[in-house]
Amino acid sequence: MPSRKFADGEVVRGRWPGSSLYYEVEILSHDSTSQLYTVKYKDGTELELKENDIKPLTSFRQRKGGSTSSSPSRRRGSRSRSRSRSPGRPPKSARRSASASHQADIKEARREVEVKLTPLILKPFGNSISRYNGEPEHIERNDAPHKNTQEKFSLSQESSYIATQYSLRPRREEVKLKEIDSKEEKYVAKELAVRTFEVTPIRAKDLEFGGVPGVFLIMFGLPVFLFLLLLMCKQKDPSLLNFPPPLPALYELWETRVFGVYLLWFLIQVLFYLLPIGKVVEGTPLIDGRRLKYRLNGFYAFILTSAVIGTSLFQGVEFHYVYSHFLQFALAATVFCVVLSVYLYMRSLKAPRNDLSPASSGNAVYDFFIGRELNPRIGTFDLKYFCELRPGLIGWVVINLVMLLAEMKIQDRAVPSLAMILVNSFQLLYVVDALWNEEALLTTMDIIHDGFGFMLAFGDLVWVPFIYSFQAFYLVSHPNEVSWPMASLIIVLKLCGYVIFRGANSQKNAFRKNPSDPKLAHLKTIHTSTGKNLLVSGWWGFVRHPNYLGDLIMALAWSLPCGFNHILPYFYIIYFTMLLVHREARDEYHCKKKYGVAWEKYCQRVPYRIFPYIY
């Protein structure tokens, strides 16, 4: 491993991302794995820079000269006087010839062009990729924090040094920029264009989920695992001793009629999404500064879906068909997901760079899985946002209702079992809460960081409706009688989880909307270099992810009504724990990168991640 060049606390000059300008910075730390330095600018901004974007102060001081020390206004004055000077006056040795004067004018013009490119101090945001809006292709950029492999163009050291005379923030005494006539602009642009460039090798982006081999196994393994779980659950004895279950022929799993019903369901939800009801809000800023608009009508879609389902039941529609063809519906959803993922990847190949996800890598297999385009839209129809809460989440509730009716029919019950009522009620509350607080989805990692590919498509359209309804599906074939005292304890556990989950999310969302709200004045915070504050009290001073803790408690509560005869009903809580621990690790990585020292202070104040005194 190469040794570091600069020590902690050393004062050097670092390149500002998106420009060729160097400013005085202090070395805070060095990551030996990524070979990146965390530096602090004079205004408090903390960034990660590569070693070749940092230079010692001595390399600049050696280039000092009289010509660079004069003020811009005086340079402009001397330039003006050189044109009006009498031709008969004998020039002094220090005076310039006409040719030298012209070259100096060009140099001055180039300097002024560089000043115009002085970067603004922008607040970073989660879905930033690598470029500022309107940045020229020929200016060298420092994109180390984003780790994107790209060609980088290099200006001369002289231009870089001149740029260091301008501070990070504009001051009153700084000279106003003056216009450059079109002839000089063309000359400068031409001269800059012919400069040679060098390709700087950048360390490959860290890939999640085990990289390309990992996502390849996930894409093929998850559908297989899903069908094995459903087949195991349908067995009379679903114990692990009877694994693997008997496998049906492939032709038995495919029915065109089932696929048609699934398409009809999807299109109905599209229709509800497009209805002009519900308020319109803006999402988080994109790389180019745009804020996409989203219509919040998920709860209205749920009400309309309930009306359609109720009317269908009243008209005598047989919903037992869904239960008897449950595996076929799972296969239809999987096929639809694969087709959608192929479409998403193909359209992303033509998407502008600013529309790509920061999680994309350039590898076709990995990008097909993680999603290459951040917010794929057809007009105003946002595919990712729609799939996150509509077909799968509302479909989960419909499947639970189907299982409740199937239990009554198969077990010849006049009313559903208490266990089935608990499972349906708990999960109905969870879905309604998500739809009612739909706006909170816009700040999640799924929306602001991950692209829309196979991972989210399969998770939203297949995994959620067919795995999250697993407890209800299990109770149809494996009834479990729950006593009222036991039911009371389970209800209390569920309510505790919901209070933690909703309280933490509501506190976070309220603080994001209005940090100066008097109702939140009692909360303690840590200020960050991005201008935002981190909550270190309330729910977020208890553990770093109290919403995850509440989520897991609720997941346990809706598994307990299934009893303890088999481990299958507890697959969800096991899987969900692994999912949230992994997601917490992803959150930790991105927050540490974004907030730097402030995040480390927060971790010291709040040492436990999800489970207090455990993890």
From Swiss-Prot:
Q: What SUPFAM superfamilies does the database record attribute to this sequence?
A: Tudor/PWWP/MBT
Nuclear topological intervals: 1-211
Compositionally biased region (Basic residues): 73-86
Stretches assigned to the Tudor domain: 1-62
> What does changing residue 586 to H do?
In SKPHA; uncertain significance
Q: What is this protein called?
A: Delta(14)-sterol reductase LBR
Q: Which family does the entry's similarity section mention?
A: Belongs to the ERG4/ERG24 family.
Per the record, which residues fall in region Disordered? Answer: 52-109
Q: What clinical condition does the entry mention?
A: Pelger-Huet anomaly: An autosomal dominant inherited abnormality of granulocytes, characterized by abnormal ovoid shape, reduced nuclear segmentation and an apparently looser chromatin structure. Greenberg dysplasia: A rare autosomal recessive chondrodystrophy characterized by early in utero lethality. Affected fetuses typically present with fetal hydrops, short-limbed dwarfism, and a marked disorganization of chondro-osseous calcification, and ectopic ossification centers.
Q: Which organism is it from?
A: Homo sapiens (Human)
Lineage, uppermost ranks: Eukaryota, Metazoa, Chordata, Craniata, Vertebrata
User: GO biological process: what's one of them?
Assistant: neutrophil differentiation
